[in-house]
Amino acid sequence: MSNAATGSRVLYLGSDQGLMRDLTALVEPKSVQLVQLGSASALAQELRRLAPEVVILDAAAVSVEGGLAAFLGTLYGGEAFHPRAICIARAGSGEDRMEQRLAALRAGAASYLVPPISVKRLASRVLRMCGIVETVRYRILILEQDASHAKKIASLLATIGMETLVVDDPMKILARMQAFRPNLVLMDLYLPGATGSELTTIIRDHDDFYGIPILFLSQEADLDKQLAALKAGGDGFIKKPVSREALIAAVEYRMRMSRWLQDRRTLVNRRETAGGFLPRDVFMRHLEQITRAREAQGGVHGLVIIDVDGSQGILNALGLTATEKLLRELESLLSKTMTPEESATRMDDFRYGLLAKRETLSKLEALASTLCQQLSGLKPQDRDIKLEVSVSVGVGLFDPPADDAFAMVSRAEKAAAGAKSAGGNQAHVWSAASRQNGAPEAESVIKRLVSTALAQDGFLLFFQPILSLNQQEDELYEAQIRMKTLDGEQMPPAEFLSVAERAEMMPRIDRWVLRRAFEVMHAERVAHPRLRLLVHQNVMTLAAPEWFPWFRDQIIKRNLTQIYPVLELQMADVRQNRAEAKVFIERLRKYGIQVCVANVTGIREEISLLARIGATLAKLAFQTIRNADRIQLTEIVQALQARGVAVIAAGIDDQATVSRVWTCRPDFIQGNYLQLPQPELSFDFQHMSHDG
């Protein structure tokens, strides 16, 4: 692959002068030469002479029978050198079908584009194939009185493409930040006229800079003074004299995390389109908030699931591109039926969710019927293809109150499944008849449900990501159990675990959860090689003599050596059975198996106990996260970390909480603000680890 500095060549076979002009303007400044050719013979000749990095083939310029795929096969057939090929299909020719894409891919194409062509995206693709990475320069403000030290830091940051501004007067910090708009601030902890802690307090009080990462440059070894600086809002320390490795690692990670939080804040507050579509995770979080509110808000709310009938047949008939165009038209029609208060999302490839509100139940049912009629009138753009489109619509009602967002999805999906099994192209409304007007299930009924679930594999695991703030690359999820009920809903653990405990069923449930966790870890070991699961257990389950041999056998049977779950215990359980907990935790640690204790309030007795029994992680109680101020929370985090216990701040459900918790420097954060629990491992840890 040629380097941009020595020049890269791209050959274009085609006659679109506008494309040639616009593409040249975008790639020439990157030292890429674009050569236009008018015939296949000229291309074959120049291919040998110029050895280009990329060839762009316009189907309109190819007259070979078999199209682009056949031409590529001929072009590459006798050549040892194969540049990467971008194929452009002809508009309205039917060349956007899956068959043509597959044929081109198998003949050697690296990319297959269908008009209309975005020249900017094409240019970006060409540059990547030429080995030219387009980078964004991030800005770092350095507040340092020592000019030579500041210059050294600026030079080190320049080597990784950072733009820097050195400031030596702390009194000018806000003015310089307003003008420079940095992505991160590096400042000396001790400055003439003001300390770094004081300046950080002022910066955090400024609306524009509240969330900007601030790292201190210091030789300060006094833990109390470090703590005071962190309490003021600092994000961390870089020890003087600064080493290149420590500087770059700290800066890149803090900026990456800051950008993620800014992206998340933007995502939560935006609409994908003017039609009221939301990203799926934002939609689910909004649904969760409405579900938990449980107060009458006027009108009748419902979750509407729209499931396209015969989806595989549509995909086979139209191909991927035409199918997506059809679904875009469906989305447009759906948005026209929505009021400004309503929102929708694409749940998966062929299912949509609509959070609807109408004045009465009959009007909500009428909406579902209207959706069936309107969406069933969709036709593919290619009128020669005879295709009937229909949808099955299911409406899940909020009355009686559901436990969470996924219970609501279960209601709507059950109704949609009923509509589909009845022949499709119709709407069904979820019935609450089996729930006795919302009355809670009797304990005897729940006990029978648990027994049935144990006998018939009636439990589910959902997974919620736990995000490291300390540059760990593991993918850590908490595995959360749910139970399927007779009416198709999913019962959260709070509703059945206490009953199971009184019925002495917890050892069997604990084993089911661990066994299922092992199955997931084994199945996902290739796709998620750094996966770790946090798995709930009870002290007395683990203390039983037969438990450890069973646990070891599960690991050996699935060849999961060195791939262990993290076992999670409840603080109240540990306090009640501290002697047993200490014994088996010590045994587990010898094998490298970690233990997390949850619902830690942060009182001195708990912190001391966690250190004595050898727990490696502590998950703070929700009420501690909600009620403690930033200084109190920081002191709890620091006290645990000083004893070798890493801290998980859970219950991060909104921007205000994440902003407050962020500066307290826990090791991990978890909550619905990151992602609601999902039935699959879908959080983008890779983006978090390597975006930068």
UniProtKB/Swiss-Prot annotation:
BP GO annotations: phosphorelay signal transduction system
Pfam families cross-referenced by the UniProt entry: EAL (PF00563), GGDEF (PF00990), Response_reg (PF00072)
Residue ranges of domain EAL in the record: 443-691
Domain Response regulatory: 9-130, 139-255
SUPFAM superfamilies: CheY-like, EAL domain-like, Nucleotide cyclase
CDD domains found in the cross-reference section: EAL, REC
InterPro entries documented for this protein: CheY-like_superfamily (IPR011006), Cyclic-di-GMP_PDE-like (IPR050706), EAL_dom (IPR001633), EAL_sf (IPR035919), GGDEF_dom (IPR000160), Nucleotide_cyclase (IPR029787), Rev_trsase/Diguanyl_cyclase (IPR043128), Sig_transdc_resp-reg_receiver (IPR001789)
Key words, A-Z: Phosphoprotein, Repeat, Two-component regulatory system
GO molecular function: cyclic-guanylate-specific phosphodiesterase activity
Residues recorded with modification 4-aspartylphosphate: 58, 188
Keyword Phosphoprotein listed: yes
Keyword Iron: no
Domain GGDEF: 299-432
PANTHER family: CYCLIC DI-GMP PHOSPHODIESTERASE PDEB, CYCLIC DI-GMP PHOSPHODIESTERASE PDEF
Protein name per its UniProtKB record: Uncharacterized 76.5 kDa protein in phbC 3'region
Organism expressing this protein natively: Thiocystis violacea
